[in-house]
């Protein structure tokens, strides 16, 4: 049976909530096992969004944080009202006769708390800030609901002066991300009287150190007719590797210390679209089973990259509606609704660079391999997937068309 994008999104969010509400006082191990079972449906929604963005501009870099998008959508459910509120909850898979709004909000607060407290060297600064026009007389119940979210807040600003509003928003997010994200809005962008900014900054410490001394400037082939010079990092070690016989690609699985894991997928020449079309949960499950440990000489570009998206436009393009768009939709949260509605901005920043740290001491014997080292060079467009193995959340999904 073929499932629509909307159905896949519903399953992803609903199963995530169901797990959180029933987890109770489970141990870390049972938490890990339970979330492993829920991960596939969450991956489906991420791939659907990724494929949609790919069709908009096949030659453009893509960088999204699926778990952050889910949190932003849940937060925006606070402001959808009337029939649109009901439609929105149906779109994301909720039955309000079986689960209350309070339980939904508490569930996402728990997930955010788990991600922020996970024992991992993956540095992540994730949050949501809602900026409200200071002329709005917001209902106390709405502001109280906003405070239910861990790492979420509601701030007022003057939207009459668009330049001042942009500066206020940009400065606040820059502070929250410790200078990593500096321009959520450019001079050409206009925030709405209710603007939600969802941000995620991702860095990490490799399990196997990458020395900056081995980094060299090398060619990266953006296309047949375009080549750029990029800092190419080098690492040699025993890692998970697969040359897929069905999908035209090679891939490696890299570990961050403790709970972070990343897949780097290198399509064969001219096969990016074919690999993108094949990205499904079954594909990831098959890769996980077929990966084998072997000695790899790996060359991969240093990456400092960001992605910015208007989520309302993206979701509308995916056929997902239900968020408010006009003045009457504000009546449930404000006594003085504005003429213009909302904007949801999703901003992601990724840093993949050298971390010349000593290896982690372990009592486990290293995997044995007798094969000759394989050389794999990511010198053309590739795909990256990043997960937190403690909560089994999809932290990042991206397509690197040009790392320069």
Curated annotation (Swiss-Prot):
Main location: secreted
Subcellular location: Secreted
Keyword Glycoprotein set for record: yes
SUPFAM superfamilies: Serpins
Glycosylation sites noted in the Swiss-Prot or TrEMBL record: 95, 225, 259, 326
Secretion signal, residue range per the UniProt entry: 1-30
GO molecular function annotation: serine-type endopeptidase inhibitor activity; steroid binding
UniProt keyword annotations, A-Z: Glycoprotein, Lipid-binding, Secreted, Signal, Steroid-binding, Transport
Family annotation (CDD domains): serpinA6_CBG (cd19554)
Domain notes: Proteolytic cleavage leads to an important conformation change. This reduces the affinity for steroids.
Protein name per its UniProtKB record: Corticosteroid-binding globulin
The organism's taxonomic lineage, starting at the top: Eukaryota, Metazoa, Chordata, Craniata, Vertebrata
Name of the gene: SERPINA6
